[in-house]
Each structure stands twice: as C-alpha cells, then as structure tokens.
C-alpha cells in the first residue's frame, strides 16, 4: 500500500485512468458489434454508416492509446471486407 502522499495520488490517477480506458474500450466494442449486427441483417447502407462511425471511434481509440494502430487497422479491414462481400453476394 502506498505510504507517501505522492504515491497515493498516483494510485488515484491510475484508478481514474483505468475506468476511463475501460469505458472507451467498451464503446469501441459496442460500435464494432453494431456493424456486425447490420452485416448479419444484410443492410448494406446501414452497415456502411455503422462502419464509418465505428472506424472513427476505433481511430479515436488509437489516438488515446486504447488500442494499437495495427490492431485498429486489422479490425477496420476485416469489417470492410465483410461489407464488401455483402455487395458481391448480390
């Protein structure tokens, strides 16, 4: 346990940052799930709209160091590929 006041402050800051990061991470996952849901329903326009919003949130997560750039790029690429396959299946 922290004894010095500065160490106690660091513990408080860590707890605060952890909660904020979990909230942001959860929001990113929620937007990704919305895209997947629209893809499963077959709504091309709604899926594209959801992807653009999710892509924005994912890149904001990269900027805030919630997820790494390569991970974000991979998630966006895979979602885009699924939407592209919706158009091919016509």
Swiss-Prot record:
Q: Which InterPro entries match?
A: Ribosomal_bS20, Ribosomal_bS20_sf
Asked whether the keyword DNA repair is assigned, the reply is no
- Give the Gene3D superfamilies listed for this entry: Ribosomal protein S20 (1.20.58.110)
Question: Would you name any one GO CC term?
Answer: small ribosomal subunit
List, alphabetically, the SUPFAM superfamilies matched.
Answer: Ribosomal protein S20
In the record, what terms sit under GO molecular function? small ribosomal subunit rRNA binding; structural constituent of ribosome
Gene Ontology biological process terms in this record: translation
Q: Which domain of life is it from?
A: Bacteria
The protein's UniProt keywords, in alphabetical order, are: Ribonucleoprotein, Ribosomal protein, RNA-binding, rRNA-binding
Q: Does the keyword Acyltransferase apply?
A: no
Family named by the database record: Belongs to the bacterial ribosomal protein bS20 family.
- Physiological role: Binds directly to 16S ribosomal RNA.
- The identity of this protein, by name, is Small ribosomal subunit protein bS20
Q: Which gene encodes it?
A: rpsT
